[in-house]
Amino acid sequence: MLGKIAVEVAYALPEKQYLQRVTLQEGATVEEAIRASGLLELRTDIDLTKNKVGIYSRPAKLSDSVHDGDRVEIYRPLIADPKELRRQRAEKSANK
C-alpha cells in the first residue's frame, strides 16, 4: 500500500507568485503534481510542452518521481538571451 506525500508546486511571475501545496500518492510524477495543483487552469500561459520544470532549481522531466517535501517549479521561457544582455551592458559601460 502506497502512502501519501506532500509536494509544493511553484510558478513565479514578476508581479505574482503561485505556490500550491498538493497531496499525492507515493510514486507520483512531476506532471501529476503540476496537474493536481490546478495551476494549469489558473494560468493558461503555462504549456507543459514548452515550459521547463525542475525540483528545487534542478532541471527535471515531467516523468520524474517526486518525493515528500519536494518543491516542483515551473519555469517561464527566457524573453532575452542572457549572453546578449551581458554583451550589451558591457558595451554600454565601455562607452561611458
Swiss-Prot record:
Pfam families reported in the protein's UniProt record: Ub-RnfH
SUPFAM superfamilies xref list: MoaD/ThiS
Annotated signal peptide: none
Domain of life: Bacteria
Cysteine disulfide partners in this protein: none
NCBIfam families: PRK01777.1
Entry's family note: Belongs to the UPF0125 (RnfH) family.
Name of the protein in question: Protein RnfH
